[in-house]
């Protein structure tokens, strides 16, 4: 029988690594949907950021993992309702980091401190 996210979260908060794995597994399809939607909506396939949906899913898993210790079932909220923003934000953080790295590769300073496209530096 499949355990609820809330029960698995409570066990994971007590240090049960198997419960944490099950919690991630229970929400794999949700994380995949968020990753696919974000990948398409931001046109990441054409962005040059070297990100794919697997990268976003991994970031989403980390977002879910980080939500576990902060979740309070006593507030009456479902775990996934609580974790969804953390999952999305973790994916967006990955995109922002990739974009910053992309910009860094594209721009460099010349000897006078003037920013130039990397292809003109030298």
Question: Where are these predicted regions, by residue range?
Answer:
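Alpha-helical promoter-recognition and RNA polymerase-docking modules of transcription initiation factors
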Residues: 1-101
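Charged, low-cysteine interdomain linkers and short loop/connector segments
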Residues: 95-122
């Amino acid at each position: 029988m499949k355990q609820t996210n809330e029960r698995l979260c409570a066990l994971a908060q007590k240090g049960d690594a198997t419960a944490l794995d099950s919690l991630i597994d229970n929400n794999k399809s949700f994380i995949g949907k968020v990753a696919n939607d974000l990948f398409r909506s931001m046109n990441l396939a054409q962005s040059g950021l070297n990100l794919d949906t697997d990268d976003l899913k991994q970031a989403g898993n980390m977002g879910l993992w980080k939500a576990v210790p902060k979740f309070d079932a006593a507030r009456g909220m479902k775990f996934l309702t609580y974790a969804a923003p953390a999952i999305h934000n973790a994916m967006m953080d990955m995109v922002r980091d990739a974009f910053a790295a992309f910009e860094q590769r594209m721009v460099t300073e010349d000897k006078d401190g003037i920013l130039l496209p990397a292809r003109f530096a030298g």
